[in-house]
A protein has these predicted regions:
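C-terminal motif of bacterial Sec signal peptides marking the signal peptidase cleavage site
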Residues: 20-23
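An edge-strand/N-cap motif at the start of beta-rich repeat modules
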Residues: 29-65
Length: 357
């Protein structure tokens, strides 16, 4: 395990984490009554309430309460296959919060807690597997690496790999294959995006010859949108797997916070290097043209407020209507069909957008 620093607004820090899984039993299964979870819509939001947090469904511009919680900070889910994954805070720490992962699959509860803290959960396309990273202690230096858990069979999946994964740079490509960016220290010193098939226990290079250091990537079908940095230059590019080629999209974006996809296009919250300002961006799925979608409305993007999309091509995100009232934000929606941005929340709160996409 080692770390490599580089600039990210102030400073990026890449921590290369070994893909290694703990061999001992790592979960507890509750065999009690069936756990009922209200069905979530494609897009949901966490909302701060007086003594708790509410999870609210968002659909067609309407916001309605689905359930209440006191300690939940993240949700990943797949309605079709009845898979719901929550991160629950146990207690606050100095550098990290002590937490646990609660899994509800087909009404049965499983707890993962063989770590101090877990984060960056990514759920597979059908909702049967999750990838996440964990920390052994209340310290960012105690990173244990990326882990994969099989929700259906209630067991960790051991990966045979010498690749050191960079932070949270891992994403499911499909139900059985996951992509991750890192270095195989046993063979070379150049980082690449690798693919691992958990069914066949097979690893292979997926994206090679990346220009500089990759700081973000998002699969789009078999292709990959990625942001890289080389010195003081940034490169937003699109990798076409079929012909093994890169197309440069822009050099103006120096950071991507989070992204999502509609059936047509790709979207992300990112920082413009020239203006030092955050925007909601769209990349056209056909032409790969980059477009800013927000200027003065909202006045400021909430880069930590999340982003998600639904089947209608509505892109939900958070922003600040009144800059004096930060950290209270509002919920906005970009409607792909109308090419418009609207505010849909009725008052400011601490919203955090999440969704199936």
């Amino acid at each position: 395990m080692f770390k490599k620093g580089f600039k990210n607004i102030g400073y990026f820090i890449i921590v290369f984490l070994v893909i290694g899984l703990v061999g001992c039993k790592s979960h507890r299964i509750s065999e009690g009554e069936k756990v009922d979870i209200p069905k979530f819509t494609e897009v949901i939001t966490l909302k701060r309430e007086k003594d708790s947090l509410g999870i609210y469904n968002i659909e067609n511009g309407d916001i309605s309460k689905a359930m209440e919680t006191k300690d939940m900070v993240d949700v990943k889910y797949n309605n079709k296959n009845s898979a719901y994954v929550f991160i629950n805070i146990i207690e606050k720490g100095k550098e990290l919060n002590k937490n646990k992962i609660t899994i509800i699959k087909n009404g049965k509860r499983t707890i993962l807690d063989n770590f101090y803290s877990a984060s960056d959960i990514d759920i597979s396309k059908e909702g049967n597997k999750i990838a996440y990273r964990s920390f052994k202690q209340d310290s960012l230096q105690s990173a244990e690496g990326m882990k994969i858990y099989d929700l259906e069979n209630k067991k960790e999946i051991k990966i045979k790999s010498d690749v050191l994964v960079s932070g949270s740079l891992f994403k499911w490509l499909n139900e059985d294959e996951i992509l991750y960016y890192g270095i195989n220290s046993e063979k070379e010193n150049k980082a690449k995006i690798y693919k691992y098939n958990v069914k066949e226990n097979k690893e292979e290079v997926y994206v090679d010859n990346i220009e500089g250091i990759c700081t973000y990537f998002m699969p789009n079908g078999d292709n990959v949108l990625l942001l890289s940095r080389q010195g003081d230059k940034f490169n937003l590019s699109y990798y076409n797997k079929k012909d093994n080629s890169f197309k440069k999209i822009s050099e103006e974006v120096n950071q991507i916070y989070k992204g999502t996809k509609s059936t047509k296009n790709m979207y992300f919250l990112g920082k413009n290097d020239l203006e030092n300002k955050d925007y909601l961006y769209k990349i056209d799925g056909n032409t790969l043209n980059l477009t800013k979608l927000t200027y003065d409305f909202p006045p400021k993007i909430d880069i930590n407020g999340g982003i998600a999309s639904d089947k209608n091509g509505s892109i939900y995100f958070s922003g600040y209507e009144d800059l004096k009232e930060q950290p209270l934000n509002e919920i906005y929606v970009y409607k792909e069909k109308d090419d418009t941005v609207e505010i849909i929340s009725d008052k400011e709160n601490s919203y955090h957008i999440m969704g199936e996409r």
